[in-house]
UniProtKB/Swiss-Prot annotation:
Family note: Belongs to the plant acyltransferase family.
Catalytic class of the enzyme: transferase
Note in the entry: Plants over-expressing AT15 have significant reduction of ferulate in leaf cell wall.
A GO MF label: hydroxycinnamoyltransferase activity
Record-listed E.C. numbers: 2.3.1.-
Its job: Involved in the incorporation of ferulate into the cell wall.
Active site: H164, D371
InterPro entries the record matches: CAT-like_dom_sf, Plant_acyltransferase
Gene3D superfamilies named among the record's database cross-references: Chloramphenicol acetyltransferase-like domain (3.30.559.10)
Protein known as: Acyl transferase 15
Keyword annotations: Acyltransferase, Transferase
A Pfam family per the record: Transferase
Disulphide bonds in the chain: none
Length: 434
């Protein structure tokens, strides 16, 4: 089936009334700055229609939400007269976000079947048509782009692309939830948003997180990675959860599967370190205010020998990942991040492709709870090539998305085409053992 997505001309949506706060500048924190110019896209699918016109309802709620989240209507600027500090500029007549109304000649079932069958990085892939095609130049003028695509069945897909400098994953999920609440008729968002938090703004990046950033930036870039949708089955996840010495989490089970299966196909030296890098919502560790939606993400890692990861009991890998998570508070407080990192990784050479897997989880950060009036999100998706094309490719990456009855969906961008079939076969083999 050929699916055609028809788009209206982009329009600028501005706050529906003067903002609730009037700060002209919001300086980016040390956590915001490294990702200030990186665009990220999330696609949220909804099975049922809103009673009123879907696109217009969301557009109106978006304008109302910007009154409370007015910095999102701004733009990233650099103050060359004040040390070159990056900040969110909340002044000017052109404040607002970009909105596109679209339609597709298919049902949700037909669309999802095609999304699953197509390689996301294929230029003809329909997933590329479900969000605004943000360019590097767009990042100088806007912080948010929203596209609402309605389907023949009444379902719809909301594609949100945003600048990581204004919000991280949990932060933008909080904002989209607020849009949903106002679309449902609530007078104001249930969570009072905070973008200016003096404690976060003045706090240095934790030394261990800085050490991790320096570590990965020094690795050899990777290229020609194979982008595919893969599902880690519910039966395999449940087998691992129940079989672990201490009941495992879904994150630990899926991370162990991806880490082991990938290491099996890329490993060249069993003694070399295998590093599982993962992002952590650090709000509770850094003391961020409730409702803070700026970037508050820290990097952490689990490390073992490649041979252990590839050939060991997967329950042991779950334990390694769990212990790494338990060390997060200690790592965030450590004064000597470089020493802690060297202790974990050792002296062996770390190769960016063979040794490192970066896993970011979009589960349980709020995307599943968005509701514009017709029920909560049915499926969470992303389109990483658009984001990854605008940043150095250092680490092979996997995006862990919303769970379904079949299992946890993962957008995999972690192996080359030469290793792709073997990687997916390893996942199938693990499933066959349950």
């Amino acid at each position: 089936m050929s699916i055609v997505v028809s788009k209206s001309a982009p329009v600028v949506v501005r706050p529906s009334e003067p903002a609730t706060s009037t700060a002209d500048k919001i300086l980016l924190s040390t956590l915001d700055k490294p990702v200030a110019t990186i665009p990220v896209t999330v696609l949220l699918a909804f099975d049922h229609p809103i009673h009123d016109a879907t696109a217009e309802t969301i557009k109106t709620a978006l304008a109302q939400s910007l009154v409370h989240y007015y910095p999102i209507a701004g733009r990233i600027s650099c103050d060359n007269d004040d040390g070159g500090h990056f900040y969110i500029d909340c002044t000017g007549e052109d404040l607002g976000v970009t909105f596109v109304a679209a339609s597709a000649n298919c049902t949700m079932e037909e669309l999802m079947c095609l999304v699953d069958d197509q390689a996301p990085d294929d230029e003809t892939a329909v997933v590329q048509q479900l969000a605004f095609n943000c360019t590097p130049d767009d990042l100088h003028h806007r912080l948010l782009w929203v596209q609402v695509t309605t389907l023949n069945c009444g379902g719809f897909v909301v594609g949100v692309t945003w600048s990581h400098g204004v919000a991280d994953g949990p932060g933008i999920a909080q904002f989209i939830q607020a849009v949903g609440e106002l679309a449902r008729g609530l007078p104001s968002p249930s969570v009072v948003p905070v973008r200016l938090d003096d404690k976060i703004a003045t706090q240095a990046v934790p030394p261990f997180t800085m050490a991790v950033h320096r570590f990965i930036s020094g690795l050899k870039p990777v290229s020609n990675l194979d982008v595919r949708n893969v599902t880690v089955s519910s039966s395999l996840i449940n087998h691992i959860i129940v079989g672990a010495r201490r009941r495992a989490t879904v994150f630990e089970a899926v991370a162990a599967v991806l880490w082991q299966c990938r290491t099996r196909v890329v490993m060249t030296d069993p003694e070399a370190p295998a590093v599982l890098l993962f992002a952590v919502n650090a709000r509770k560790y850094l003391g961020a205010k409730d409702g803070y939606y700026g970037c508050c993400t820290a990097m952490h890692m689990a490390v073992s020998k490649s041979g252990t990861v590839a050939n060991g009991d997967i329950m042991k890998l779950v334990g390694i990942i769990r212990r790494a998570k338990e060390q997060i508070p200690e790592q965030l407080k450590a004064d000597d991040g470089e020493m802690m990192l060297r202790t974990m990784v050792g002296e062996k050479q770390v190769n960016g492709y063979e040794s490192l897997l970066y896993l970011t989880s979009w589960r349980n950060i709020g995307f599943e709870d968005v509701d514009f009036g017709s029920g909560k999100t049915a499926r969470v998706m992303t389109y990483p090539p658009r984001m990854l094309s605008m940043m150095p490719r250092i680490a092979p990456i996997c995006f862990m998305l919303k769970a379904t009855e079949e299992g946890v969906r993962v957008m995999s961008d972690c192996v080359t085409a030469d290793h792709a079939d073997a990687f997916y076969q390893e996942i199938a083999k693990l499933k066959a053992t349950t």
